[in-house]
Regions:
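Histidine/cysteine-enriched polar flanking segments
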Residues: 1-110
Length: 110
């Protein structure tokens, strides 16, 4: 793993706006009881539908905790552009709790 010794802004990196072109979308499978009734059961079909719609034009990385990863992998087994990653999560709002990238004026991603 590479560790950077400076802050991204010091090297000309910035957080891109949501509407800017990007490589793909990170989603998190909804299961958290504090956010979703019945372990997300009623929200999961909508998340699957949204992921498939997004995957028509870009890569989707769907994060799922170890307890749910098998079922989520089965859900998207036939979807070539959706990649399920087994990662412990705390919520389904990837924008709030997921990974993020910064870019510079040359399009370099960090």
């Amino acid at each position: 793993m590479h560790t950077f010794s400076t802050l991204p802004a010091a090297e000309g990196f910035r957080m891109p706006a949501e509407y800017e072109p990007h490589r793909g979308c990170v989603m998190i499978w909804p299961v958290r009881p504090g956010s979703w009734l019945y372990g997300g059961r009623d929200a999961q079909p909508a998340f699957a539908q949204a992921a498939r719609a997004i995957a028509e034009s870009e890569t989707v990385w769907m994060l799922a905790g170890p307890a749910d990863a098998g079922a989520v992998q089965a859900e998207f087994a036939g979807d070539e552009n959706i990649h399920v990653l087994t990662i412990e999560t705390d919520d389904a709002w990837a924008r709030d709790v997921g990974p993020t990238c910064v870019v510079d004026e040359h399009g370099t991603v960090r």
